[in-house]
Amino acid sequence: MADGTAANSSRRIFLIATEESGDRLGSSLMKVLRRRLDDAVRFEGVGGRSMAREGLVSLFPIEDLSIMGFAAVVKQLPMILRRIRETADAVIAAEPDMLVIIDSPDFTHRVARRVRARRPALPIVDYVSPSVWAWRPGRARAMRRYVDHVLALLPFEPEEYRRLAGPPCTYVGHPLIEQVGMLRPDAQERQRRDAPPPALLVLPGSRRSEIDHHMAVFGETLRTLQLDAGEMDVVLLTMPHLIEKVKAAVASWPLQPRIVVGEQGKQAAFRVARAALTKSGTVTLELALAGVPMVTAYRGGAVEAWIAQRVIRTSSVILANLVIGENVIPEFLQENCTPENLAPALREILTDSPLRRRQLKAFAKLDAIMATGQHSPSERAADIVLETMHASRGPE
């Protein structure tokens, strides 16, 4: 492991994160790197508010790249390509000792390839593996040309990289495991989980397109469920930039939810929730770690659905199912995302059913599956970043 000895001169590390989740990872990594290098480090790159609090001045607002959906990407393609060129040029001009790309592979990997072509000696670490195990597995082998090490958030990913002949890959741990204590209930909150009326979480997504696709079907699902299950305490979790859009959407719902915004409110809601209706994604792993049984749903545009049906190679698209290694969480995707399917499944997990018990039993395995030993994920990530940087020839 890397020691904490400061370099003789300040190290320069260029980081690129273009989504909020990557921004949080980058911020935690920056904190540890600064501590390990005794403050003899300068950060440059692209990031959001969390990385800005650690001193990063972003080349451009990451909101420029918060685009989802085939049609939206096509419309914004000239701007995206310009940002890729600008970012690669900025890396070259900065002459850093290390480049760390964080998630968002459609953007960051294009930057990395350009940088590797112009600065072949610059070490590049990829923090958050692309889903090579789910689709386009040939990417793993291709990454060997421009990535020196992959930092994996999921425990099964290193073996997938070995199988696919990709670059070295190390499981450093998912940041969610550092938040487990804030997600799980104390004794009083556990009593609330079991008390009537049941608290049902609704998580339609964090992007505008997801709100557009999910809110109507989720509202109708709750109407159907209420007819059968009776009174419920429905809590809808959303993001600050979506709150007005969400309020407009729920105005027509027969059952009005409490709308919660912010991390503390979300964690408090997780601790007392009996069950959840959620879109697919990382939030399924968060709910599983919190011990909240769930039903998952997802609707996308027609083009995205057509592509997904032809390229996804896994038996489930639910992250929690993949980490557990068992399809315990029901998933209703695209044309199957209907109130007729969702309401009965939710009714089942709200009661003490075999499905609910099976989910809870599977969720209890996650601590052992995702364990990282004595060090936090960001500490393990920093170790490999420093080892890779020290092993390189440095700037040309």
Swiss-Prot record:
Q: Which InterPro entries match?
A: Glyco_trans_19
Show the catalytic activity: a lipid X + a UDP-2-N,3-O-bis[(3R)-3-hydroxyacyl]-alpha-D-glucosamine = a lipid A disaccharide + UDP + H(+)
List GO BP terms, alphabetically: lipid A biosynthetic process
Asked if Transport is a keyword of the record, the answer is no
Q: What is its EC number?
A: 2.4.1.182
**Pfam families assigned:** LpxB
Q: Which GO terms describe its cellular component?
A: membrane
Pathway involvement of the protein, from the record: Bacterial outer membrane biogenesis; LPS lipid A biosynthesis
Keywords assigned by UniProt, alphabetized: Glycosyltransferase, Lipid A biosynthesis, Lipid biosynthesis, Lipid metabolism, Transferase
Task: Tell whether rRNA-binding is among the UniProt keywords.
Answer: no
What does it do?
A: Condensation of UDP-2,3-diacylglucosamine and 2,3-diacylglucosamine-1-phosphate to form lipid A disaccharide, a precursor of lipid A, a phosphorylated glycolipid that anchors the lipopolysaccharide to the outer membrane of the cell.
Q: Which family does it belong to?
A: Belongs to the LpxB family.
* Designated name of the protein: Lipid-A-disaccharide synthase
Which species is listed as the source?
Nitrobacter hamburgensis (strain DSM 10229 / NCIMB 13809 / X14)
